[in-house]
Amino acid sequence: VLSAADKGNVKAAWGKVGGHAAEYGAEALERMFLSFPTTKTYFPHFDLSQGSAQVKGHGAKVAAALTKAVEHLDDLPGALSELSDLHAHKLRVDPVNFKLLSHSLLVTLASHLPSDFTPAVHASLDKFLANVSTVLTSKYR
């Protein structure tokens, strides 16, 4: 459960991301593909080279979903219900991959927002991404 301080930290950090959300989303995907090559198996039809239009496009989708989640911190299940259905029933993404993308996103944010990425903000973002991952995998059962 996110505390009021966590929610404030998440909103402030995501506010700093601003217009770079799609770019950071794509960078986090690229980082995940490089660091955890098995994640590429879910994207057999993508050009996974750095800077590819498909990775940028999916990065924008990831960023849009996270932006929606930030806007609905008090109702993540409602905000992410369709995305949860998609990943559980159609795409069948192994739940561990959400943790890998979350880690890659944290590294990406830390590299772009070093002065804002305090231990408290890191902890809040980590909790937020864990909550998003939990919601996205909730319909697997």
Curated annotation (Swiss-Prot):
Record GO biological process: hydrogen peroxide catabolic process
UniProt keyword terms in alphabetical order: Heme, Iron, Metal-binding, Oxygen transport, Transport
Keyword Protease: no
CDD domains per UniProt: Hb-alpha-like
GO molecular function, one term: iron ion binding
Positions with a binding annotation for O2: 58
Stretches assigned to the Globin domain: 1-141
A GO CC annotation given for this chain: blood microparticle
Described function: Involved in oxygen transport from the lung to the various peripheral tissues.
Subunit field text: Heterotetramer of two alpha chains and two beta chains.
Protein name per UniProt: Hemoglobin subunit alpha-1
Organism: Bos mutus grunniens
